[in-house]
């Protein structure tokens, strides 16, 4: 067997007849499969053991030779070689066709490769191949045109006219084969190149297409006549199996039926030819053979598909590859794996961040081989077989061994759908009773898991390397940050938030207020014994917490705090300031001075002078976690998170918050507010009846009135709420629910949307506490149902978007340290009108500068060129008043097939500089796809009457951008740089004309009357600027401006959609995707290169082709950039394996075979398909080829504080 990991590349070509014969182990002559009496394969049939190998290991068909010792002997009685039965998956046979047959992929594909090679129309080809017309092959001395078609009648007439043998005309695939053999590739190519110099329009397009195909044949060494088959390969029998079902019936693969038809027809044709049957009968049989082979290769491509029982179309060879159930996606890209299990999940509140609970029964099955090895090593059993019996019997001793085996052996947990890389994480297993897997509550957010019946899969990494990678790279405790935005993904939620909220509440006048304690223990003791309340404000000696970063003037004082906050701060990392107020100043700069008693001051006096602080909410906890991570990195953060979780659960249990109907407050003046609204609506309707407003205006006014009424109720609710009300606490802390839920419980439900999407004028006046009337209930059910269907549709849409994104960017990997480019990207804050979508500070964090940044006023250099911009540095740059900075960007990176570390910046998931080998393309795709489900499905109307276009938003807009479609509501853009000199309105055509005066001439643009203008007379506009509101068509922008402007525009547009929905995504992810859409160019003029005009190629390949020509002083080729949607870009990738496994499998393979394409296995997908280690992360050559060194050869790293991660990477490099 070939060692997959030694592959350099993989090529696909057309198979020549001699190649097919060399694969074959014998000819299949009979359509029989197996003998139904003996169940043995028939001789010379489709399952013949002589051709394909024995059905049982080391045993010939007749049973003369059995056992491995006869390996390699061919039995003299039955002719079967004694070998493994596995060869029945590898050995092929063949069928010698009695008449040539065209291959349907090359004849029927779009464009028809046969048609282009011969310069014949597909329809003409079809007539010839299926025996409806003759084609002139050699006119000899007659005036007939070569390749012209003759009907049966015309053929006879011409024969009589010119005499027999005066010209050659044939029908069927044989004729096509003769024509293909006559094609002189070199001469045709030269002729077409000449033609291209003068041709234009349709003629030129056709010439370019023919040239493309002929050139492909010429370069690849494939012969055009191989598109017609004389010999048909038969795939190995174990790939088209026959299985016996209960009851003696057989289930067989459809391919066997299709092969049987071919063999039957082929044998019948052979017999007819032997008998010298009449031509018409032979022709008919040849046509049927042609159709049988078509059905075998691609059933249903031409005419009606051949059906099996129950009129189900049979699955042909092409169907075996296509689609989700095809070979590529079902078996090569996603396999079922051993050592895996699946179970329902339950919460494990006592687990540590790096642990998960595994039921004993699952663990013993998953770790069976490890346990058996230990049993034999401890000599509890003599051999593996006995050990296996011990495990299956459930011997008492196996449980202790299991405990040993799983120690330090991480397992992987995965929850479907795996939307991003945090959907699979590693944990150390802890054995538990019961049958459910136990999951740490904090990792739920990353998995998007809850405990209402979700299931998860568990996998065991087997090899030492796999275990090391799971522990070092995938351990859940290491994944604190979300790769999409670099914010913590493990923020506490629900009970944990509620517990910490309750713990940090303050209350005036509670028992024990004003007591002073010498240290934490005394305070806790007072609280436990009922002398002080959790919320009462008390004093504590500062010097009892010597490790906190106090200011010098605070160290010897007494500080005012609450018992709860003493407990809360006790779990904080030591070097974090004492948290007294839930704000960033306290977190970053230290505890404010107002909480400290001056010597001799009365504590009650200070307490009375202080305001009551609000408790710590979910957002504040998130900020604390982010700060902890920034200062202390992973290990300390995950330990702190566990303490925070335990404290939260403990105190939410103690608080015992419950919610009942009596906790929903009643708004005293609800009736007044609603009466006033009714009154206002009546006035509006009166005005409408008098003709003072249009129906549209009335509708807007009515809906606005009810909206304002609802807001008034909401406002009243917030004003009158009691902060100790459990519902209010739940909402305010961020544990669950928000103000709109609260206002539906206590205020009014408000306006509802009708099924047509329009808002109904009749609002629902009741709230859930009062209960809804039947009519109100009926109105509100539509919204609920629409919500459910929307979610279902959105999930599918978002999943498909992620798949396309992953496909287009899967080969973008960090390939080198620095590409040395001299280009950069000038960035500023992204704005939408007056609103800031993304600030400059956010965009700068974690990027490298391209040029140094100077203070705009003092001229002082804030940061040099090619330096990493940290969070603090970004703030400093923005505070200095800098508005734009030139940074290194993925857009301008010069690395081939990937990105370099400097152009990418930090890895958001770790907060450190990105490592070489990181698969940033896949991470980018997941980061953009994963929040897709949070985007809305709706396309909004923009405010009533003002505009005549719909503006697409949410998920449809993201798809529109990434597929580079023409947007809905397109903006008119200018092609000249200059000033707007005039905007004239033309009432007759209902349009406006905008005139822009540039240096070279005047630009005149017609825009619809109703369009909102973005420019006024006198404005200065750049090329490609939008004159009206709406989305710019990116392909149009590319014609007017350069690639970088288009990339910048697309980046800003994607960010606008996501930010408007409150989803943050790092710029670099969008940059990676957009760069992939613009990596191809189309050759315009080939110059002195041997490129063909109109060819689509990678920018790097194009530059290479020009390099040699420029050096030798020739004329280089010219090209223009092409913007491709992600689906098209995936299919145009250089790897045919990746493209074929994505979509349009047959088209991709047809094209690749003709070109004799080589797949250099650079991306991830192609390596997964052939089963090779992927060239990313630890699979990169630079990590795999490391030679182990003796310790004395390695330079010792300085013994400053080096974290475990740093040591690991230093060794890896």
Curated annotation (Swiss-Prot):
SMART domains the record matches: RPOLA_N (SM00663)
PANTHER family found in the cross-reference section: DNA-DIRECTED RNA POLYMERASE (PTHR19376), DNA-DIRECTED RNA POLYMERASE SUBUNIT BETA (PTHR19376:SF54)
Source superkingdom: Bacteria
Catalytic activity: RNA(n) + a ribonucleoside 5'-triphosphate = RNA(n+1) + diphosphate
Entry binding sites for Zn(2+) 2: 819, 893, 900, 903
Binding residue positions for Mg(2+): 450, 452, 454
Cofactor(s) it depends on: Mg(2+); Zn(2+)
Residue sites binding Zn(2+) 1 per the record: 60, 62, 75, 78
Entry-linked InterPro entries: DNA-dir_RpoC_beta_prime, DNA-dir_RpoC_beta_prime_bact, RNA_pol_asu, RNA_pol_N, RNA_pol_Rpb1_1, RNA_pol_Rpb1_3, RNA_pol_Rpb1_3_sf, RNA_pol_Rpb1_4
Entry keywords, A to Z: DNA-directed RNA polymerase, Magnesium, Metal-binding, Nucleotidyltransferase, Transcription, Transferase, Zinc
Entry annotated with the keyword Plastid: no
GO biological process: DNA-templated transcription
Protein name, per record: DNA-directed RNA polymerase subunit beta'
């Amino acid at each position: 067997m070939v060692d997959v990991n030694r592959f350099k590349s993989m090529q696909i070509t057309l198979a020549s007849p001699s190649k097919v014969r060399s694969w074959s182990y014998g000819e299949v002559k009979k359509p029989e499969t197996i003998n139904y009496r003996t169940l043995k394969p028939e001789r010379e049939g489709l399952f013949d053991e002589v051709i394909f190998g024995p059905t049982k290991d080391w045993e010939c068909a007749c049973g003369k030779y059995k056992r491995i010792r006869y390996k390699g002997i061919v039995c003299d009685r039955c002719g079967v070689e004694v070998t493994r039965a596995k060869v029945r998956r590898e050995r092929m046979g063949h069928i010698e066709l009695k008449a040539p047959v065209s291959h349907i992929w090359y004849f029927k594909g779009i464009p028809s490769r046969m048609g282009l090679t011969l310069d014949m129309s597909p329809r003409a080809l079809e007539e010839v191949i299926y025996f409806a017309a003759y084609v002139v092959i050699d006119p000899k001395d007659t005036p007939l045109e070569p390749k012209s078609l003759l009907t049966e009648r015309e053929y006879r007439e011409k024969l009589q006219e010119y005499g027999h043998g005066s010209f050659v005309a044939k029908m069927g695939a044989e004729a096509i084969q003769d024509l293909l053999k006559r094609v002189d590739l070199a001469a045709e190519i030269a002729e077409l190149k000449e033609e291209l110099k003068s041709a234009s329009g349709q003629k030129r397009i056709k010439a370019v297409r023919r040239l493309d195909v002929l050139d492909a044949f010429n370069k690849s060494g494939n012969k055009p006549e191989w598109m017609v088959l004389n010999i048909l390969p038969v795939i190995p029998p174990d790939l088209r199996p026959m299985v016996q079902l209960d009851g003696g019936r057989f289930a067989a693969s459809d391919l066997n039926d299709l092969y049987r038809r071919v063999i039957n027809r082929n044998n019948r044709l052979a017999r007819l030819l032997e008998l010298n049957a009449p031509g018409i009968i032979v022709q008919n049989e040849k046509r049927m053979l042609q159709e049988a082979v078509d059905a075998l290769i691609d059933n249903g491509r031409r005419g009606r598909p051949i059906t099996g029982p129950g009129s189900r179309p049979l699955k042909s060879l092409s169907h075996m590859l296509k689609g989700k159930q095809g070979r590529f996606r079902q078996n090569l890209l996603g396999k079922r794996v051993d050592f895996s299990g699946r179970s329902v999940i339950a919460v494990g509140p006592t687990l540590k961040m790096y642990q998960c609970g595994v039921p004993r029964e699952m663990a013993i099955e998953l770790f069976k081989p490890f346990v058996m090895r230990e049993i034999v090593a401890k000599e509890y059993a003599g051999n593996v077989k006995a050990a296996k019996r011990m495990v299956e019997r459930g011997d008492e001793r196996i449980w202790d061994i299991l405990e040993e085996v799983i120690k330090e052996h991480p397992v992987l947990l995965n929850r479907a759908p795996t939307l991003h890389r945090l959907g699979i994480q590693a944990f150390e297993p802890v054995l538990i009773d019961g049958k459910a897997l136990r999951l740490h509550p904090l990792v739920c957010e990353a998995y998007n898991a809850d405990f209402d019946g979700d299931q998860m899969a568990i996998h065991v990494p087997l090899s030492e390397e796999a275990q090391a990678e799971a522990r070092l790279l995938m351990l859940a405790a290491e994944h604190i940050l979300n790769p999409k935005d670099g914010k913590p993904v493990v923020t506490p939620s629900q009970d944990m938030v509620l517990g910490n909220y309750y713990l940090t509440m303050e209350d005036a006048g509670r028992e024990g207020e004003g007591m002073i304690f010498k240290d934490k223990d005394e305070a806790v003791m007072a609280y436990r014994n009922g002398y002080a309340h959790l919320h009462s404000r008390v004093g504590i000696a500062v010097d009892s917490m010597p490790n906190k970063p106090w200011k010098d003037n605070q160290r010897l004082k007494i500080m005012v705090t609450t018992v709860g906050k003493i407990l809360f701060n006790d779990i904080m990392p030591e070097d974090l300031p004492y948290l007294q107020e839930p704000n960033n100043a306290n977190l970053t700069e230290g505890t404010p001075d107002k909480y400290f008693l001056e010597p001799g001051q009365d504590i009650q006096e200070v307490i009375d002078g202080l305001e009551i602080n609000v408790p710590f909410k979910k957002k504040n906890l998130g900020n604390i976690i982010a700060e902890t991570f920034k200062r202390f990195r992973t290990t300390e953060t995950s330990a702190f998170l566990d303490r925070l979780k335990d404290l939260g659960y403990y105190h939410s249990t103690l608080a015992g918050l419950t919610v009942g109907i009596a906790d929903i407050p009643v708004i005293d003046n609800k009736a007044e507010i609603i009466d006033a609204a009714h009154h206002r609506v009546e006035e509006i309707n009166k005005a409408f009846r008098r003709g003072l407003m249009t129906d549209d205006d009335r509708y807007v006014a009515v809906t606005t009135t009810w909206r304002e009424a609802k807001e008034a109720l909401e406002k009243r609710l917030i004003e009158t709420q009691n902060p100790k009300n459990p519902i209010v606490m739940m909402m305010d802390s961020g544990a669950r629910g928000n103000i709109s839920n609260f206002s539906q419980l206590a205020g009014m439900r408000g306006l509802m949307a009708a099924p047509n999407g329009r808002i109904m004028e009749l609002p629902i006046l009741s709230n859930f506490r009062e209960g809804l009337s039947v009519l109100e209930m009926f109105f509100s059910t539509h919204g609920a149902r629409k919500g459910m269907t929307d979610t279902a549709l959105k999930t599918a849409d978002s999943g498909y978007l992620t798949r396309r994104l992953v496909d287009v960017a899967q080969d973008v990997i960090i390939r080198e340290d620095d590409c040395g480019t001299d280009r950069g990207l000038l960035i500023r804050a992204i704005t939408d009108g007056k609103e800031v979508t993304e600030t400059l500070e956010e965009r700068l964090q974690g990027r490298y500068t391209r040029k140094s940044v100077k203070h705009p006023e003092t001229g002082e250099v804030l940061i040099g060129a090619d330096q990493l911009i940290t969070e603090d540095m970004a703030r400093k740059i923005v505070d200095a008043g800098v508005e734009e900075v030139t940074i290194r960007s993925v857009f301008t990176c010069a690395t081939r097939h990937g990105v370099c570390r400097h152009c990418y910046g930090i890895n958001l998931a770790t907060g450190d500089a990105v490592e070489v080998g990181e698969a940033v393309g896949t991470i980018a795709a997941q980061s953009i796809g994963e929040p897709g489900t949070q985007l809305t499905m709706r396309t909004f109307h923009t405010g009533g009457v003002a505009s005549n276009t719909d503006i697409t938003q949410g998920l449809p807009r993201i798809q529109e951008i990434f597929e580079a479609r023409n947007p809905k509501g397109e903006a008119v853009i200018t092609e000249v740089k200059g000033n707007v000199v005039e905007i004239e309105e033309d009432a007759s055509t209902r349009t406006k004309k905008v005139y822009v005066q540039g240096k070279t001439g005047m630009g005149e643009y017609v825009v619809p009357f109703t369009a909102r203008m973005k420019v006024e007379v006198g404005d200065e506009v750049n090329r490609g600027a939008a004159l009206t509101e709406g989305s710019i068509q990116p392909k149009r922008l590319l014609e007017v401006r350069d690639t970088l402007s288009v990339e910048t525009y697309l980046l800003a547009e994607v960010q606008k959609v996501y930010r408007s929905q409150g989803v943050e995504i790092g710029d670099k992810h969008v940059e990676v995707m957009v760069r992939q859409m613009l990596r191809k160019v189309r050759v315009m003029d080939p110059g002195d290169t041997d490129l063909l005009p109109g060819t689509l190629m990678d920018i790097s390949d194009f530059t290479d082709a020009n390099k040699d020509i420029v050096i030798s002083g020739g004329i280089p080729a010219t090209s223009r950039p092409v913007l491709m949607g992600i689906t098209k870009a995936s299919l145009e990738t250089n790897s045919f394996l990746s493209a074929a496994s994505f979509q349009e499998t047959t088209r991709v393979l047809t094209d690749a075979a003709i070109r004799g394409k080589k797949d250099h296995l650079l991306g991830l997908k192609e390596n997964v398909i052939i089963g090779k280690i992927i060239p990313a992360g630890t699979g990169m050559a630079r990590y795999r080829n490391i030679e182990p060194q003796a310790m004395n050869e390695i330079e010792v790293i300085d013994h400053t504080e080096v974290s475990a991660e740093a040591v690991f990477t230093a060794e890896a490099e």
